[in-house]
Each structure stands twice: as structure tokens, then as C-alpha cells.
């Protein structure tokens, strides 16, 4: 059987009750917490930074998958690693050199995620798949929760799964 992991996003949580919301997810059986970090530059929204993640980390034993929707991402990787991220997920479009950013995350002993926007091509990561622990296929344009699903991403998922099975 597949090892399926449940990783709910806290983007739509009540930020004034974030500690309580995360505790409810932990008690509910989540395997990890997906933290969307937005800078108002790479995406048109602002969320949380390293100090909030560090504070949440003190009260949660679950892994944190920190999805960095910030640019330039490379200069902030270490701050999020130090704050308590277990997985750092980045976008190819947010770095000058994806492989360098991936290697920086690995050097910090964190797992690497790469996120592909609906319009991003799989070719951006094909040659780096052996260095990536997680691929996040965005089924909406990044920046806001509650958007309409973009069905065209299903073909991207099928293509990536086929590539994975051929390795």
C-alpha cells in the first residue's frame, strides 16, 4: 500500500488562534503541517515569516512543510530552516539557480520540495528529480486559498507519475 501523508494547509486558519488550530490538526491525525509563506512580491498576498514558524514549532511535534512563495527565495532558505521547517518547498521561478537552492536546502539537512505552478513546465525539474523529495503540483495559481481547481494540471500529474515510474 502507498505511504500517503496528510498535510493540511494552515492558510485558511484563524491566524489569531493559530496555535489552537494546529493543535486541532495534530489531534485530528495530520501527518504534517503545510505552511504557506507569501511575500507580496512573488505572489500578491502576505502571510507569515520565520518568527511565527519558530513560535509554532515549540508547540507542535508534526513536521512542517514550509512552502516558500517568496522571491528571491535563495537568501531566505536558511532563516526558514533555522525557524523549524522540516521540508522546504520552493518554486523554480523564485530562484536564479534551482539546483543551487536545492543543494542549499539539502546542506541544511532539510527535505526538498519543488512546487510547479499550473503554467510551469515539468522540464524545469526533470534533471533534478533525484535531488527532490517532494513535488507540489499547484492546481490553482499561488497566492490565495479557495480558488477554482485548474483541471489542466491533471495531465502534468500523469506525466510526472509516468516519469517517476520509469526511473
Cite the ranges covered by each PLM segment.
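Conserved N-terminal beta1-alpha1 strand-loop-helix module at the mouth
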Residues: 1-89, 93-97, 104-112, 120, ...
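Short glycine-rich anion-binding loops that position phosphate/pyrophosphate groups of nucleotides
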Residues: 140-142
Amino acid at each position: 500500500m502507498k505511504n500517503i501523508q496528510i498535510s493540511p494547509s494552515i492558510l485558511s486558519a484563524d491566524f489569531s488562534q493559530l496555535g489552537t488550530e494546529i493543535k486541532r490538526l495534530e489531534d485530528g491525525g495530520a501527518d504534517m503541517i503545510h505552511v504557506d509563506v507569501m511575500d507580496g512580491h512573488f505572489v500578491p498576498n502576505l502571510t507569515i515569516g520565520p518568527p511565527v514558524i519558530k513560535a509554532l514549532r515549540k508547540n507542535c511535534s508534526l513536521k512542517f512543510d514550509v512552502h516558500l512563495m517568496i522571491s528571491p527565495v535563495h537568501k531566505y532558505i536558511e532563516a526558514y530552516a533555522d525557524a523549524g521547517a522540516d521540508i522546504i518547498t520552493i518554486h523554480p521561478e523564485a530562484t536564479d539557480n534551482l539546483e543551487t537552492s536545492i543543494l542549499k536546502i539539502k546542506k541544511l539537512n532539510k527535505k526538498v520540495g519543488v512546487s510547479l505552478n499550473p503554467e510551469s513546465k515539468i522540464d524545469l525539474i526533470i534533471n533534478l528529480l533525484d535531488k527532490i523529495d517532494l513535488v507540489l503540483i499547484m492546481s490553482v495559481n499561488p497566492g490565495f486559498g479557495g480558488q477554482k481547481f485548474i483541471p489542466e494540471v491533471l495531465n502534468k500529474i500523469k506525466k510526472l507519475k509516468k516519469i517517476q515510474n520509469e526511473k
